[in-house]
C-alpha cells in the first residue's frame, strides 16, 4: 500500500460563542482549520485535521500548517501510510520541528492503518479506555455575566467540566465565584 494522493482543505470553523483572550485584546469568532485527505493506491482514504488558535496567539496557524504540508508532501508520496514511523521520519527530513503541521498527516495515516487492519485506532495504540470520561467546555467570555451564561448552556448540554479564561484579569475572582455555582467543585479549571 502506498500514498498516492494528498489533498488539503481549508475550512472556517465558526465558534458558537466568541472567545476572548489576552485581557480582552484578542477575540476569536472562527478558527482556521486544515483538513488533510490521504488516499492510497489500494483505495483507502484517511483524514486528519489541524485547528490551532489564530496566528496572533500561538506560532502554529492555519496557513503554516498548509505550507508545511506542501513542503512535506513530496517526501511522503509513495510511502506506506501504515508504517507511521517511516512517514514521521520522512516528514522530519523534509521539515524539522513543526509538529502542528505534521499532526494532520499523522492522523490520516493512523486512520488508514486502522481501516486496513479492521480495528479502531485506539487498539493499534494499545487499547482504549472503556471508562467514560467527562468532556470539558472551553469558555473565554468578556464579562462575568457572559461567562456564567455560556457555562450554564454547556452544563445543560451535558458538559461535566469547564475551562475558562478571563478576558480581563480583574474579573477572575468573580468568574471563579460564579462558575462554582454552575459546576461542582474541582470541575472548573481556570487557564
Language model segments and positions:
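A generic structural signal for short
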Residues: 24, 97-99, 138-139, 168
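N-terminal amphipathic alpha-helix/helix-capping segment at the start of soluble metabolic enzymes
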Residues: 1-5, 9-11, 89-92, 114-115, ...
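Glycine-rich, aromatic-flanked loop segments that form ligand/cofactor-binding clefts
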Residues: 100-101, 106-142, 146
Amino acid at each position: 500500500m502506498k500514498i498516492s494522493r494528498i489533498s488539503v482543505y481549508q475550512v472556517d470553523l465558526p465558534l458558537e460563542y466568541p472567545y476572548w483572550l489576552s485581557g480582552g485584546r484578542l477575540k476569536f469568532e472562527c478558527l482556521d482549520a486544515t483538513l488533510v485527505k490521504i488516499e492510497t493506491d489500494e483505495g483507502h482514504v484517511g483524514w486528519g485535521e489541524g485547528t490551532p488558535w489564530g496566528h496572533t496567539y500561538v506560532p502554529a496557524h492555519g496557513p503554516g500548517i498548509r505550507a508545511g504540508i506542501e513542503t512535506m508532501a513530496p517526501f511522503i508520496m509513495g510511502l506506506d501510510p501504515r508504517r507511521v514511523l517511516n512517514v514521521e521520519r520522512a516528514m522530519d527530513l523534509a521539515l524539522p520541528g513543526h509538529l502542528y503541521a505534521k499532526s494532520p498527516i499523522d492522523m490520516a495515516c493512523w486512520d488508514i492503518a486502522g481501516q486496513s487492519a479492521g480495528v479502531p485506532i485506539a487498539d493499534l495504540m494499545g487499547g482504549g479506555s472503556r471508562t467514560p470520561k467527562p468532556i470539558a467546555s472551553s469558555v473565554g467570555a468578556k464579562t462575568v455575566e457572559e461567562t456564567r451564561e455560556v457555562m450554564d448552556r454547556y452544563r445543560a448540554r451535558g458538559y461535566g467540566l469547564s475551562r475558562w479564561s478571563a478576558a480581563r484579569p480583574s474579573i477572575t475572582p468573580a468568574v471563579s465565584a460564579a462558575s462554582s455555582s454552575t459546576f461542582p467543585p474541582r470541575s472548573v479549571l481556570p487557564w
